[in-house]
């Protein structure tokens, strides 16, 4: 078998060089600024609560509530502050499980929606109902992401810890697709389900998804205690080869993407201007899901002040660069255990 891992890493390396070159060209042409004076995109981790108990959860959602200090009222206050500062192009809604906020979720989204913000929603789909989907249909979406981790209820439900979760996710996906909202399926590939990858692509296509993201489990959060769900080298190589095959087979039917390797993602963020980050349930502003660094807390410091003081050049800091350089490509982890070790203030 070909070394598909090596091939994909070569493609990633070439992509990084092209991104760097394009940025330099656009800067010389005056088409790319030295920095962004305000985030273009923000991810709202609205709650640390979750109604499932997924083995791979990167941020350990549901573990003792994960310090949810940002109440719905505080999220609304933050949204108003963002609008007052000039607004953002994109808001990613996640958690935990964001639909646990009930009607208050829509209160938060309404504030940004009225200012022209478009959304990505990331959910396990369990709480989706026709009524909720109807309410979602008024917003502008880049996409609406539902996680389905098996072609059968048995595989998905065992992985996500709640019986009946597969059926609810599938029904929710159908409702989203039928409402004309762009549906993306996120599928975590493990040794237990890797043989059904093609079946999963077919299911996603039949559900009406425009894209499926096939990602391996990264050693972060709860996954660190569940090493049996992490692909070994041969399984990962097989997955990469299968993705290439399926991209050809399903061309013009459904977009099939693999999640990028950790070092590639981190290096790309370092090359580009910092364009955003994550507001966590405790108010901390985190650089990325997989980057264990914070620049402050919105409950203590205004977002704009924090961004201008620490956010713009955060990816260039010595601590972050040392972490990126420590990443082992085969193990997909660096010197800091993500969502296990304490995040570092930069």
Task: Locate each region found by the language model.
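Conserved alpha-helical substructure of the radical SAM core
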Residues: 2-143
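Flexible mid-to-C-terminal extensions adjoining Fe-S/redox cofactors in radical SAM and related proteins
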Residues: 2-38, 288-346
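Residue-level detector of family-conserved "landmark" positions at structurally sensitive sites
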Residues: 57, 92-93, 122, 146, ...
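Phosphate-coordinating loops and pocket residues in cytosolic domains that bind phosphorylated ligands
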Residues: 59, 130, 138, 158-161, ...
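Residues within well-ordered alpha-helical secondary structure of globular protein domains
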Residues: 81, 111-114, 203-206, 245, ...
């Amino acid at each position: 078998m070909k070394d598909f891992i090596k091939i994909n890493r070569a493609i990633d390396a070439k992509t990084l060089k092209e991104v760097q070159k394009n940025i330099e060209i656009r800067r010389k042409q005056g088409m790319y600024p030295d920095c962004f004076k305000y985030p273009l995109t923000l991810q709202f981790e609205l709650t640390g609560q979750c109604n499932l108990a997924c083995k791979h959860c990167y941020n350990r959602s549901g573990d003792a509530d994960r310090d949810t200090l940002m109440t719905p009222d505080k999220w609304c206050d933050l949204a108003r502050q963002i609008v007052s500062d000039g607004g953002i192009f994109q808001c990613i809604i996640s958690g935990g499980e964001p639909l646990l906020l009930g009607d208050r979720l829509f209160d938060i989204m309404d504030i940004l929606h009225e200012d022209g913000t478009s959304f990505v929603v990331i959910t396990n789909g369990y709480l989706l109902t026709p009524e909720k989907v109807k309410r979602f249909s008024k917003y502008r979406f880049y996409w609406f992401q539902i996680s389905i981790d098996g072609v059968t209820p048995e595989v998905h439900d065992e992985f996500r810890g709640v019986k009946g979760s597969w059926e609810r996710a599938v029904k929710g996906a159908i409702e989203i697709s039928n409402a004309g909202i762009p549906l993306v399926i996120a599928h975590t590939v493990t040794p237990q389900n890797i043989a059904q990858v093609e079946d999963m692509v077919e299911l996603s296509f039949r559900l009406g998804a425009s894209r499926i993201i096939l990602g391996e489990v990264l050693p972060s959060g709860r996954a660190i205690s569940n090493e049996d769900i992490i692909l070994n080298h041969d399984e990962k190589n097989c997955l990469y080869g299968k993705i290439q095959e399926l991209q050809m087979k399903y061309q013009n039917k459904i977009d099939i993407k693999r999640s990028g390797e950790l070092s590639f993602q981190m290096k790309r963020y370092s090359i580009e201007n910092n364009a955003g980050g994550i507001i966590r349930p405790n108010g901390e502003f985190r650089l990325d899901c997989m980057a264990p660094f914070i620049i402050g807390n919105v409950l203590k410091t205004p977002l704009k002040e924090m961004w201008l003081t620490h956010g713009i050049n955060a990816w260039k800091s010595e601590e972050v660069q040392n972490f990126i350089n420590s990443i082992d490509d085969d193990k997909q982890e660096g010197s800091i255990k993500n969502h296990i070790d304490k995040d570092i203030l930069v």
